[in-house]
A protein has these predicted regions:
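Substrate-binding cleft and catalytic face of glycoside hydrolase catalytic domains
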Residues: 18, 44-133
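N-terminal carbohydrate-binding accessory modules
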Residues: 1-50
């Protein structure tokens, strides 16, 4: 059932990927096996009637350098959600930034994140719902 029907049954896939004070990154989608099983995970959504999903590609993977974007880890999952008719609530940045950026306190964060958000919107124009940060 599409969100514009007046009702949606939503869930989210935990996609935190913070860098700890030790410098070690903890990627929750990696830890729970989602990268290896995303097709199965998305199939389970459909099997229980979920029609909206808070989901986003890992910002640190898709924005590997200033003005450089790598959508290779995002394209197939995003397209599969679209094919399943699941409304994506795009989680653009969830508890972590690319290593080159340094952190949320970096004065350049808003500029680089804005660039990423623009590129995401151009790449996936069918996504209309967002949780930016």
């Amino acid at each position: 059932m599409p969100m514009d029907s007046g009702f949606f049954f939503a869930t989210g896939i935990e996609n935190s990927y913070p860098t700890l004070s030790t410098g070690r990154r903890i990627d929750q989608m990696d830890k729970c096996g989602h990268y290896a099983r995303w097709e199965e995970d998305f199939g389970l959504l459909s099997s229980i009637g979920v029609n909206a999903l808070r989901f986003g590609p890992a910002y640190y993977l898709t924005h590997p350098a200033p003005d450089r974007f790598d959508w290779s880890s995002a394209d197939a999952p995003m397209e599969r959600l679209r094919a399943l008719g699941v409304t994506v609530i795009a989680d653009l940045c969830h508890f972590g930034v690319p290593d080159w950026l340094g952190g949320f306190q970096d004065v350049a964060f808003p500029i680089h994140f804005g660039s990423y958000a623009r590129e995401f919107a151009l790449r996936y124009p069918w996504v209309r719902h967002f949780t930016p940060v």
